[in-house]
Amino acid sequence: MLAGGILLLPLVCLKYNKWNKKGVEMPNTVVIGAQWGDEGKGKVIDILAKKSDYIVRFQGGNNAGHTVVVKDKKFILHLIPSGILHKGKICIIGNGVVIDPKALLDEIDNLKKEGIVVNKKNLIIDERAHVIFPYHKILDSLKEENKGATKIGTTKRGIGPCYTDKAARCGIRICDLIEPSIFKAKLEANLKEKNKVFKKTYNFKGFSYQDILKEYSKYAKQIKPLVGNCSIILNKAITNKKDILFEGAQGTLLDVDFGTYPFVTSSSSSVGGAFTGAGVGPTNIDRVIGVIKAYTTRVGEGPLPTVFPGTTLEKVRNKGEEFGATTGRPRRCGWFDAVVGRHAVLVNGLNDIIVTKLDVLDELKEIKICIGYKYKGCMYKHMPANVEILQKCKPVYETHKGWLKNITNCKKYSDLPKEARNYLDRISKLVGANIYMVSIGSKRSQTLTK
C-alpha cells in the first residue's frame, strides 16, 4: 500500500458540453495555477479572453505579476486582469483581491501610456475589496525581518497583513475608502491601534493620520468612478448568457489551505477562491483549467523537491527567463513534479491542463519526471501536508529522451517531435488530466491546441 495513497476518480464537469473545440462559445471558466505560480497564466488568460465577455481577478494583490506579449510588446500586469488588452471586454477586480490604490493607479497610467483604454466601461473594482495601507507594507517587512532563518519569502507588499486585518474584521474596504466620513473614522481607529503595536513591539515611530488621510483621499476620488458591486454585475451577466473568465493569481501550491503551508500566500489561490473572491456560485462554473509548466519553478522560500543540479538550473533559468515579474528575484527551477500536478488536479477538479514553456527544454538530452517521493522507506504519490516531512522527501524519477530540436516554429500539435509528444502524454497520464493546449514561446501565435 502506498503511503499517502488516494484513489483518484474522474472529475466530470456537469456543463462541460457547453464547450466545443472550435471555440464557438467560451464557457464560464476558471484558470488556476497548478504549481507555485509563474506558470504562464497571463498568456493563457490573454488567449482565452478573446472569447469571453468578462475577465475577473478574484484573489491576491500586486504581489502577483502576469506577463503578456502582444506584437513583441511586453505587458506586466499586477492587479488588472489580462483581458484589459482586448477591446470590448469588461475587466473586474473582485472582492477577494487586496488593493494598493497607488499600485493600481500606476498600472492604469502605464496602460494608458501604451494606448490601452482604461475607464469605467471596461474596468470595475468591487466595493468589498480590502485596501492596503502603508502600515501593512511596513508590518510585512518588519515581521519578515524578525523571522530570520524561518522567513517565508514575502514580497513585502503588505498583502499578508491586509488579509490579516480582513480576517480580524478591522480592515478598510473600497466602500469605506470612497465615503469620506466613514474612511476618517475607520482610519483613525486603525491607526490608534496600529501605532501602539509598532511602537511597543517594533520600536517603530508609527504613522501620521493626516498624511495617510490626505494621500488616500486623493486615491479615493480617482478610484470612485470605477467602483461597483461586482457580484451583482457578474450574476446578471450569467443570467444574460455572457461568458466569464476567472483569472487566478499565484498557484495551487501557494494556496493558504492546500499549499506548502506556511510557505504560502494569504489567499485562496485554488478554485474555491474564485467563488468567494468574485461572488459567484460554483454551479455557475462550467470549466476549470490548470496552467502548468513543463518543468517546475518556485520563487521565495519553501520546499522544491525536484530542484535541478547547478548547470541545468542555470541553463533552464536563463533560457526560460525565470525571474519574478513582480520582484525580479531569480526563481528556483526543477524537473516536472507529477506529485504536485496530481495534487492540483485533485483539489481544483481540473477538467484540462495547459502546459507552458515546453520549448525551454529543447536543448536537454534527458528529461526527468518526478513520479513520487520517498520518505523513511515509504513511497508517497500525493503531497504530505507536513512541510517538514516534504523537505526531507527524496524525489523518485523516471527519465525520458529529449527531442533536441527547436519547437518554437511548430504550427500544430502534430508538428511536435515524437519525444515531446511522448513527454506530454506521460505528464497527462501521471497527473490525471487531459492536455488542452501547449505553449512553445511567449507570443500568442506560439500556442498549440491538442
PLM segments and residue spans:
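Short, Lys/Arg-enriched N-terminal segments with co-localized hydrophobic residues
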Residues: 8-25
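Non-transmembrane, aqueous-exposed alpha-helical and coiled segments at domain scale
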Residues: 25-450
